[in-house]
Amino acid sequence: MKKLILHEINSLPPLPSSVIELDDYKNTDNIDVEQLIEIIKKDPLMVANILKVANSSMFGFRSKIETLSRAINLLGVKFTVSIAIGSAIQNTIKSNLLAYAVSNQDFIYTSSLATNIINTWISAIDFDLKNELLLPAFLQEVGKFIISEVIQKEKRTEEFLQELNETKDISFCEQKYMGFSCGRITANVFKHWNLSHNIIFPIAYAEDLESCPDSFKQKAQ
């Protein structure tokens, strides 16, 4: 399985230019909303996913959010960037989550929920830490697309689903079938794309804090 995972990761196409632009934008101190809108509008899928999240029951806004600018205003710049990058990465991997019996839209929703928890809880404690954790929180389960692809190619989908139903322990099943945690696979996907250690390390060591470099332990907890 390990060789199959590495093959899937090494076969991934390069990230689209929009993700690189968003990552550069995220790392600037000067937040220009109009510039962000111009970057996101280049990718209709990004726009669609941002609007779906903004109109989801998670937020419960009274009126329908129909424009990107209003969505950014309500969700916040950092949250919006996380959704945009996450949807672009999902589309780049071009896989599905059939092995987990969930849809890609379910993935976007649950990832947004994890990000919203960080956005709500951590911001009251440490605003700077919150901004650093939003993107890792959204992206931490990306490895599931690789796992699902490998499971399907090995024709073990029914077996994997049965194990999930019996154990109710996703992490255990992933480790058993893959030999790696989802976090480790996700981290290796992002290492393949040369993404920042600020994204990779909190995900890679979330379940192995003892091995985590000291400078990243707070982010991985």
Predicted regions mapped to residue ranges:
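Post-HEXXH active-site segment of zinc metalloproteases
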Residues: 151-168
